[in-house]
Amino acid sequence: MKHRALHPIAIVLLSISFAHAEDWPQWRGPSLNGVSTEKNLPVKWTTEENIAWKLSMPEWSGSTPIIWRDRIFLNVAEGNDLYLWCVDRTKATVLWKKLLGSGNVKMRKQNMSSPSPVTDGRNVYVMTGTGILKSFDFAGKELWTRDIQKDYGAFGLNWGYASSPLLFEESLYVQVLHGMKTDDPSYVMRIDKKTGKTIWKVERPTTAIRESPDSYTTPGLLRYGKTTEIVITGGDCVTGHDPATGKELWRANGLNPENNPSYRIVASPIIFNDIIYAPTRVRPLLALRAGGRGDISTSHLLWSTINGPDVPTPVTDGKYFYIVNDRGIMWCLDAKTGAEIYGQQRLKPGTYSASLVLADEKIYVTNEEGLTTVVRAGPKFEVLAENPLNDYCLSSPAISDGQIFIRTATNLYCIGKK
């Protein structure tokens, strides 16, 4: 497997870790926004054609595989138990499996393996929907373990916990935004990645009611100038926090203008350069300018749209902003102004839950039947290919070293050249 030199732009994008462009170290990839700098990626495939290998999986999951060089890590449910798998990328074999805990529960599109692992290239960190958070080295040695529910109380989300940790420098950032099944406050916490100890834990207040405090999103990382902030969406608002202390620096309301009691949020915040894009339950999606303090609901609002997604997280290259809703309707907007470039273009009918990824001037969109539509990036809607895997799929694609990895209910596929 060849390794490419890093483009200077990629160094800026990937400064959150030591990852190379060919790695996919966390759910939304090397730049934390679903964008990869990879080139010459596969465009067409079937279950038998253009498949480098496939590995049998015991269960479906919303968790995305993460990749570092020749290692792939997966959060896996096997019956009642939950495991971290380490897979040899070159041999398509399981190197080791480590038990994370038991108590797997299935709830519609959710089970307790939904959070994706993260890695810094030395160790891997994984959380389960049951609140178990563990660290392992690449040989499978357990370094530390936490039980977040035991420490801070039971999770109270209607559909179970699904947020992935955010890894930044020497810390993990974990959010627990809930309210449907608990009166306990929502919170955000920072954990030392070396020891597993809590550095800080702050409450995140909300006026959202019933199910609307619940958030299945993953924290985002905003970097502009010399400033770094942790971005959290849920509970009818989006907030920015100081990584050093957890202090809330700014807040934008408006994600639930009608105070709908069932406005839980699934799609995660997208950050590109100095713009924060905050989806909610379809409408509205807000675009906010970085740099604000206090209430920025109006002062830093760049644009909004009523044509947001529910489950799939959108993607942007900084020029165009791409949205696919749960029914497979696609929009392209101007990323800076929100002006519609094209709208209501229908992909193949189906239900869409996986998040969009963008690479090689293409957008990859996978539906729940395992069909990936490849759309040319740019101002003109053009479908390049429709690629069926004919299997249940909730997991988002991962891209690494010229190959695409898609996890279905029965297989992990490595797509591309062997």
Residue ranges, per PLM feature:
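Positively charged n-region of N-terminal signal peptides that target proteins for export
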Residues: M1-A5
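Bacterial N-terminal signal peptides
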Residues: H7-S17
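Noncatalytic, solvent-exposed loop/strand surfaces
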Residues: H20-K418
